[in-house]
Amino acid sequence: MPIKIPDTLPAFDALVHEGVRVMTETAAIRQDIRPLQIALLNLMPNKIKTEVQFARLIGASPLQVELTLVRIGGHKAKNTPEEHLLSFYQTWEEVKHRKFDGLIITGAPVETLPFEDVTYWSEMQQIFDWTQTNVHTTMNVCWGAMAAIYHFHKVPKHGLKEKAFGVFRHRNLAPSSIYLNGFSDDFQVPVSRWTEVRRADIEKVPDLNILMESDEMGVCLVQEDKGNRLYMFNHVEYDSTSLADEYFRDVSAGIPIRLPYDYFPHNDDTLTPLNRWRSHAHLLFGNWINEMYQTTSYDLNDIGKGRGI
């Protein structure tokens, strides 16, 4: 079944053009089932592009999903029209009374700052605590993953001498994991970050299990059973051109940047990159949503009971 999103959301037409099944709010009402309620806390500067990336993966599920777009209340977005935010987004304060089957927390362009120096860190801490009582399962991505694993387990992030940037081979460390069902033994994942979390720090926490890792880029995906959380430190959701967009943006701004590793054909930035991670991105999100469906409560009000802070 398709993803349910507002009829006038810019992502609607983009997804239809790609062949992703989407459903109007009017049509969804006629289906006598409870759709999965998934929220996207979008911390990225270009919110519209990020909406499309995650809605594409969610919409490929055979289950009906209702997507709620959420933003930080006290933070002024610089790269997304205010009209778009007012039309399609709610602040966390406006949705915190609700319960959700799933929550995705995106990356944010603040990864070189200490967490405590991020202007909205206090609200992020409240959101993380809120997920324990109001969200069945959370997918934390890039900075969102680093922030969450630091908040819950004090696992630190470490700065890198140069940006981890490109497409890298990763290993499947847990073939029997429900989240890696159908995964190859090795696969490609886009990476774009200035910081990392380290295996040695994660291994100090008994509840954390490393599912995906790269010899060059280190830890990629961590599962925490106790809190129903996944920590994805890289960007499986990226479009084919996302790394190119970042590269040319930095080049235009005069920021020193290397070509993204193993990305442009023949390392020629005039050639169109091939997407070699799309199928595994769909597998990961499909498995996450399937597990969500299998384990969540039919009554949304029961989500989080007995899990508390």
Curated annotation (Swiss-Prot):
Keywords: Acyltransferase, Amino-acid biosynthesis, Cytoplasm, Methionine biosynthesis, Transferase. Pfam families: HTS (PF04204). SUPFAM superfamilies: Class I glutamine amidotransferase-like. Disulfide bonds: none annotated. One of its GO terms (biological process) is L-methionine biosynthetic process from homoserine via O-succinyl-L-homoserine and cystathionine. Pathway: Amino-acid biosynthesis; L-methionine biosynthesis via de novo pathway; O-acetyl-L-homoserine from L-homoserine: step 1/1. GO terms for cellular component: cytoplasm. This is Homoserine O-acetyltransferase.
